[in-house]
Amino acid sequence: MTQSERAIVIGAGAGGLAAAIELTAAGYDVCVIEAANTVGGKMNQVVVEDHRIDTGPTVFTMRWVFESLFATLGYNLDDELHHSAMPILARHWWHNKTTLDLHADIDQSADAIGQFASSADAAGYRRFCADSESIHDTLRDTFMAAQKPNPLSLVHRVGWHRIGALMQTRSHQTLWHVLSQYFRDPRLQQLFGRYATYVGSSPLQTPATLMLIAHVEQAGVWRLEGGMSSLADAMQRVASSAGASFRLGERVDAITTRAGRVDGVITAAGEKLQADVVLFNGDNRALLQGLLGQSVQRPDRLQHSGQRGLSAITWSGLISAQQAPLSYHNVLFQEDYPSEFKRIFHQGELPHKPTVYVCAQDRERGGCPSAQERALVLINAPSVDTAAFNEDNVAEQAKLAVEAVIDRCGLDIKLNAGHVCRTPQWYSERFPGSGGSLYGGASHGMWSSFIRPGTRTRIPGLYRCGGSVHPGPGVPMATLSGRLAAWAMIEDRG
């Protein structure tokens, strides 16, 4: 590779930003083009009555990913990002103010589970933590932080002498089934089954391998000063310091090729920009649907388009909740968890009694700072192309369902006027090709991880990253996908 080689990154989500850092460190001339006026993709904020409120991901985990990334250009994460560990991972609510806190300390959580359910469930929790750590350790460097494998290459990476450990990742069993082997109390099965939604999936269909998410959270959840968008800002700042340029508020209409090889992009303004390599940081289906031009419409020899992952309906705004003992992360459950996913994935309907997530962004130190506080409220929803409801009244319908769940949990929470509501249709328009899914394809079935697209394509010079690409959705995983894409570029260019 020569110093003059130019890389264009389409999209400034976590993956695109991570790739920009890696590529500038390797000496590439990097230009990041983003349709929005801010970086971060789904890591975003809105302003309501002069308050900045997170609208997207709110959980910061896998700190090691970002420490390593920032160190690529000689930066220390602690110097660039103000963050603090959270002693309470989440507070969970059921009927009539029944609550359970999960703590960063396993012993505290086990004691809480023993009082909430039984000593047998507390013992089951300890086994669950040990097994989820084992799964995580087996797959961290062989799958998550490595290029997309096939089943055989994964066995080689793990090692034939550790085939037993690979079998214990439980990809052949569903998360919902395996949780019943640890917990007798159905509420605990519900609580830990929710980890499937972190990858946009149903616990009834996703492999039990996703237990590893429990260990990811147990290893640390941090609160970021300034919200998750401060992470995106820090990534942009680091990339810019090494020479990456950013063109915000500009859309790419097409990726161009010459003699079968990528040679640049055309912007919505009609400007042709030359490039030696192009990285697409967006939903892979945008390529498949021809939204970036016919010449790159078939990025893979075999095209897989499985079931879409979950979408969401969100409200970002101010709430009145002085009498509600909220934590920073709160989950409000209804009694029939499987019905939620059957309605979403099989009927394309909103759940009658949805699980409600409330991120009370002013509660990190306990207590309520004022009569009004910032919050993100979220429920799961079907993607646009599977939805069987009327988009015109879906927000009001969903709000009534949320209020019913809040009341049933015995909480006094009022969403004030002036909030910003986003629906599957909004997400579909903001992230082309996604159909409103926030996670790419659903992780349903034992082969889902191998069907997810890799960073390389069959078109020379074209790469991809993001939540719809290996290793999967979520800010840390999308960040890893960007790094993997950059490493693939560097390796292929020599």
Q: Which role fits each region the language model picked out?
A:
Residues 212-262:
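Helical element adjacent to the flavin cofactor pocket in flavoenzyme catalytic cores
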Residues 185-199, 353-357, 411-471:
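A glycine-rich dinucleotide-binding beta-alpha-beta segment and adjacent secondary-structure elements
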Residues 223, 253-369:
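Mid-domain catalytic core of redox enzymes
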Residues 3-138:
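N-terminal glycine-rich phosphate/pyrophosphate-binding loop and immediately adjacent elements
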Residues 57, 467-489:
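A conserved FAD-binding loop/helix module that cradles the flavin
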Residues 95-205:
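Rossmann-like flavin
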Residues 257, 490-494:
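Active-site-proximal substrate-binding core of FAD-dependent oxidoreductases
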Residues 320-428:
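C-terminal segments that line or cap access tunnels to active or ligand-binding sites in enzymes
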